[in-house]
Amino acid sequence: MPTHQTVERFVKLVEAGKGLEALDLFYAGNASMQENQATPRVGKAALRAGEAAAQAAVSDMTARCVCPILIEGDVVVIRWIFDYVDGQGRAVHFEELAYQRWAGDHILEEQFFYDPGQFKARA
C-alpha cells in the first residue's frame, strides 16, 4: 500500500515533465498500462517505449493533477489534466482518470479512462 507521500512524489515528477523518471522509479518490472479498453502494454520496457514515443510525438506538454488524490489501500485514482501541442502544431487539452493498483511503492497495474474525442484541436 503506497503512502500519500509516495504518491505525491510520483505526481510531482509527472507534473515536472519527468514521466520517464517516474516510470523508472515507481512502476514494477512487470507492470501493465492500459488505455481505456485497449490491450494492455506489459513490462517496464514496453511501458517506457510507449511513454517515450508519446513524448516524442508532442511538444510543450504540461500535466496537472487535480486534487484530491484518492487512495484506498492498494488502489490510487488520480485525475490528470494535460495540455500539449500535437505533431500538426495544434493545441490539445484533455483530462483522464488514472486507476492504479500498487504493491508497496510500485505501480503494478494502471488503466486510463478518458474520452478519445478530447484529442481534437481546441476551437
Residue ranges and their predicted role:
Residues 2-6, 20-74:
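A solvent-exposed, acidic/Ser-Thr-rich amphipathic alpha-helical stretch
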Residues 6-13:
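Solvent-exposed, amphipathic alpha-helical segments
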Residues 45, 88-90, 118-123:
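A short, polar/proline- and glycine-enriched secondary-structure boundary/capping micro-motif
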Residues 57-60, 84-93:
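Short, cysteine-centered beta-strand-loop-beta hairpins and adjacent loop/turn segments enriched
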Residues 62-65, 79, 92-98:
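Short, surface-exposed coil-to-beta transition loops
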Residues 72-82:
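A short hydrophobic beta-strand element
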Residues 82-84, 102:
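Hydrophobic beta-strand positions in extracellular immunoglobulin-like domains
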Residues 95-121:
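Short beta-strand edge/turn micro-motifs at domain boundaries
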